[in-house]
């Protein structure tokens, strides 16, 4: 395992760490009952009835959990 030759200053450590950022997730758009619905494509989404009650979960066009 590599061992650093010199101590890295607090300022350099924090400057390096500040570059690590979370990327914005890409939302997918879907029209449901005339209204746009945005969801994450890699997650299961809830399918609701006309009253807003949850019927089941769907992922990649299949019923899950």
Swiss-Prot record:
Keywords: Ribonucleoprotein, Ribosomal protein. Coiled coil: none annotated. It comes from the Bacteria. One of its GO terms (cellular component) is large ribosomal subunit. One of its GO terms (molecular function) is structural constituent of ribosome. One of its GO terms (biological process) is translation. Belongs to the bacterial ribosomal protein bL32 family. This is Large ribosomal subunit protein bL32. It comes from Tropheryma whipplei (strain Twist). The lineage of its organism: Bacteria, Bacillati, Actinomycetota, Actinomycetes, Micrococcales. The gene is rpmF.
